[in-house]
UniProtKB/Swiss-Prot annotation:
Gene behind this protein: Tmem183
Record field: compositional bias (Acidic residues): 95-106
Region Disordered, residue ranges: 1-21, 94-128
Entry-linked InterPro entries: F-box-like_dom_sf, TMEM183
Superkingdom to which the source organism belongs: Eukaryota
Signal peptide per UniProt: none
Protein name per UniProt: Transmembrane protein 183
SUPFAM superfamilies xrefs: F-box domain
Length: 375
């Protein structure tokens, strides 16, 4: 009995203490050497082997410290000083510590980026730039495409002034001129020596010689897909008609209405057009500025009332009664129509053209726009 009671009451000295289930193992920084790094420490390892699926930050910092020490770098330059300050001391690798480190790094990156931005803003507090001479802009203008002239002139005042000079437009004309170009008499090289209307003549010639501009006007259909709305409140300056004899047995009639669009400065009193320098006024003179031509071709002659000097207020294109052609209706008033004002059917002078073969709208730079040789 004594033997049995003694064995039951005494402690078991040779009992081995087992680790608790689920407890993480301790990580020692000196264990993370090049000889003990396994494939399981990297992101491409099997997730079944490594639960996290990525390299622990302390492992990466330890390897980084070892590499830098081998390269002769001081330990103070290693980013993870605090985690590896005591070599040989245990440090627990917890997910929460990784998240806190990531937050600290993101905070430091944001502070550094803010400092860089503040330095950039402090470099030029007045916002003043460097002004280049006019000759530099004139040299750069020699490499500008015709469709980029507007963007080039908006760079600065000197760039805009260059586009006002006669030298700029003369060089632009010579750059795109070819001997086989079919040009009207006013747009030929011997007539381009005149400074008056030089800019307008060069722009007109580009629609004959410059392929991108010529391709734009060649795509215009005989009947526009939508009714043009740019002619509203335009003034009719001139009207004429002529007989067209073609392949058809019966001739067609062409009715032309020359309009002058409303000037932008009339729409808003605060808006004023930028005027070129006085010495270049002749270069920018254009009698047909803001003008366009409405050309309507009909299958027979139609009587047209006098509409010159009146304001064009309504333009509609519908299907004709025979369902094979189109019908054009024009309405003219004595005064412009304000926004939102409705017109009655009996108001104004109405012009009805039916049946219509074609409807075309030409701006002043179009090759088919009639302009005076004295321009």
């Amino acid at each position: 009995m004594a033997r049995g009671s003694g064995q039951l009451g005494g402690p078991h000295r040779d009992t081995v203490t087992m680790p608790k289930r689920g407890k993480r193992l301790k990580f020692r920084a000196h264990d993370a050497c090049s000889g003990r790094v396994t494939v399981a420490d990297y992101a491409n390892s099997d997730p079944a082997v490594v639960r996290s699926g990525r390299v622990k930050k302390a492992v990466a910092n330890a390897i980084q410290q070892e590499v830098k020490s081998l390269c002769g770098l001081e330990a103070s330059q290693v980013p993870a000083e605090e985690a590896l300050s005591g070599v040989g001391e245990p440090c627990d690798i917890l997910d929460s510590s990784d998240e806190m480190d990531a937050q600290e790094e993101s905070t430091q990156e944001r502070s550094v980026s803010r400092k860089k931005k503040s330095k950039r803003h402090k470099e030029d507090p007045d916002g003043t730039g460097e002004e280049y001479p006019m000759d530099i802009w004139l040299l750069l203008a020699s490499y500008i495409r015709p469709e980029d002239i507007v963007n080039f002139s908006l760079i600065c005042k000197n760039a805009w002034t260059v586009t006002c000079t006669a030298a700029f437009w003369t060089r632009l004309y010579r750059r795109h001129y070819t001997l086989d170009a079919s040009l009207p008499l006013r747009l030929r090289p011997e007539s381009m020596e005149k400074l008056r209307c030089l800019r307008a003549c060069v722009i007109r010639s580009l629609y004959h010689m410059y392929e991108p501009f010529a391709a734009r006007i060649s795509k215009n259909p005989a009947i526009p897909e939508s009714t043009p709305s740019t002619l509203k409140n335009s003034k009719c300056l001139l009207f004429w008609c002529r007989k067209i004899v073609g392949n058809r047995q019966e001739p067609m009639w062409e009715f032309n209405f020359k309009f002058k669009k409303q000037s932008p400065r009339l729409k808003s009193k605060c808006m004023e057009r930028l005027q070129p320098p006085i010495q270049y006024q002749d270069v920018h003179t254009n009698p047909d500025q803001d003008c366009c031509l409405l050309q309507v071709t009909t299958l027979n002659f139609i009587f047209i009332p006098i509409v010159m000097g009146m304001i064009f207020t309504l333009f509609t294109i519908n299907v004709s009664t025979d369902m094979r052609h189109h019908r054009v209706r024009l309405v003219f008033q004595d005064s412009p129509v304000r926004g939102g004002q409705n017109l009655r059917s009996e108001q104004g002078v109405q012009v009805v053209l039916d049946p219509v073969h074609s409807v075309r709208l030409f701006d002043w730079w179009h090759p088919q726009y009639p302009f005076s040789l004295r321009a």
